[in-house]
Amino acid sequence: MEVLSIAIVSFSFLLFLFFILRDSRPKNLPPGPRPSPIVGNLLQLGDKPHAEFAKLAQKYGELFSLKLGSQTVVVASSPAAAAEILKTHDKILSGRYVFQSFRVKEHVENSIVWSECNDNWKLLRKVCRTELFTPKMIESQSEIREAKAREMVKFLRGKEGEVVKIVEVVFGTLVNIFGNLIFSKDVFDLEDPTGGSVELKEHLWKLLDMGNSTNPADYFPIMGKLDLFGQRRAVAEVLQQIYDVWGVMLKERRGTKGSESKNDFVDVLLNAGLDDQKINALLMELFGAGTETSASTIEWAITELTKKPLVVSKIRLELVNVVGDNTVKESDLPHLPYLQAFVKETLRLHPPTPLLLPRRALETCTVMNYTIPKECQIMVNAWAIGRDPKTWDDPLNFKPERFLSSDVDYKGNDFELIPFGGGRRICPGLPLASQFSNLIVATLVQNFEWSLPQGMSTSELSMDEKFGLTLQKDPPLLIVLKARASNI
């Protein structure tokens, strides 16, 4: 009898919730699939929402809506729809939907990624735009990135003939690049995985993995404050562990303030008068977003090259013509148009953040003659846009040549190619990310040949994706490297 009573009460509550949600559905939304009671369209997502959204766009149009649990979501899937979201209505749609696991108050309030576009956010963006990522600052630190690329080559030469998970090596290299840009020191030892600040790398990996896990509260926000699954608490603990690692370095630098400047990011942030909470949040996002997205892009690039030996030959020939037998440097990159076209093509098919980061409508507005209600969540499917046959000729064919005769770029003005977003929320580290990808790909192609392990053919190489905050290759790429006797 008690079980029956509980069942009746539970069913009554769900039925009540269903009618509340049904009656509160906004009018004149973009078209979309009919939602099921309670769960909405959640069961249609699968493990690759970006691909499922692309299929829904083919049926319902470039701007469609759906219900994910109790959340109303609108998805843009064409350059025109993306321009409406990221440019025409950029201001009113600039709110950020913060994933429930990452709603750690001290971090969100000081975050350049998750906070609202308030005065604090504007200050952090200004510091990035006018201090950290200026052409002058980036150029002044090119020798650091080149030195770390050479160290990567030295490490990989020592692994010749062994099976290497290339994304881990690239990730470690990028962590050290950021360590030197920010603190003027390595934080990870490629030669000794147990040495250096290995815990920082491990904490970053752990945090990024948490970002790829599902939290039911994202679909039923009423559960959010309860943190029933402990995911927010776990994120807060890892964030604190990361802050503790570089807290010692920050304290040391504050103690020596006024002595000889190291001209690194910490100097800039301290001179800007930022407190530790702001610095912690900004450094977290530089390390986290800057390393993972670039590492993913480079892994996809090497995967495509593994399947396309002719493309490898073209990049290598261009390197010979421009660089000769010298080591490739960042100053060479503007003179390597085919390499740049190759990286663009990689980003077209494998955008690091396939749905960008979700936005939120600050007020009700009209987009493409449809109503976008206040608090609605908005996603832009950069993955689908990059594969849109109405925009790209033969879109599923990997063809860098398409960019040699095109002015389309990924700097936020061409909505056909938006791997880093656009509008006021565009990734502030875009100029640096571009340097990373081009330099490391060029360095690997110049110094190594590689093959798949155990005689695997390229036709057996999986191109499957693992969806998350970043679009990872699944499984990770394993290769066997062979050092080239000459750069020519």
Swiss-Prot record:
Keyword Chloroplast included in the entry's annotation: no
UniProt topology in membrane: Single-pass membrane protein
Sequence intervals crossing the membrane: 2-21
Location of the protein in the cell: Endoplasmic reticulum membrane; Microsome membrane
Catalytic activity: (S)-N-methylcoclaurine + reduced [NADPH--hemoprotein reductase] + O2 = (S)-3'-hydroxy-N-methylcoclaurine + oxidized [NADPH--hemoprotein reductase] + H2O + H(+)
One GO BP: secondary metabolite biosynthetic process
Residues the record lists as binding heme: C427
Cofactor(s), by name: heme
Protein name as it appears in the record: Probable (S)-N-methylcoclaurine 3'-hydroxylase isozyme 2
GO molecular function: heme binding; iron ion binding; N-methylcoclaurine 3'-monooxygenase activity
Pathway: Alkaloid biosynthesis; (S)-reticuline biosynthesis; (S)-reticuline from (S)-norcoclaurine: step 3/4
Organism listed in the record: Coptis japonica (Japanese goldthread)
Lineage: Eukaryota, Viridiplantae, Streptophyta, Embryophyta, Tracheophyta
